[in-house]
Amino acid sequence: MTYNITIGNKTIEITESGYNILKAILDIEFSPPTVVSFCSLGGYSAQHVNHWLNHFTLFGVLDYEGINSTTFRLLKLNKDFELFITNNQ
């Protein structure tokens, strides 16, 4: 399976963990600014989640700021993208 995100007219292949982290973020009841625990996003390490938050910021999907080693503040979430899985078989 291939995990993808389409933003505007650009499609980017992402990892399964990146897909799962973004899906978990989309499930958050978001009203800016929302404080989020790294461990609430699929059980990945804070470093791994932070890695993907940086990618999603560069992609224009969200904006965030770190608070400490366990939480971050979700400042903006652009829902103008499509997250999808394709089967390569």
Per-region residue spans from a language model:
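Charge-rich, solvent-exposed alpha-helical interaction surfaces
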Residues: I21-A24, W52, F84
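A short, conserved structural fragment
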Residues: T57-I67
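Short, cationic-aromatic polyanion-contact patches
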Residues: N9-G18, I67-Q89
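Surface-exposed polar/charged interaction patches
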Residues: I28-S31, F59, N87
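N-terminal leader/targeting signatures
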Residues: T34, W52, L77-D80
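Long, low-complexity, charged/polar intrinsically disordered regions in eukaryotic proteins
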Residues: M1-T11
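Short amphipathic alpha-helical interface segments
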Residues: I12-S40
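Short amphipathic alpha-helical interaction segments
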Residues: G43-L58
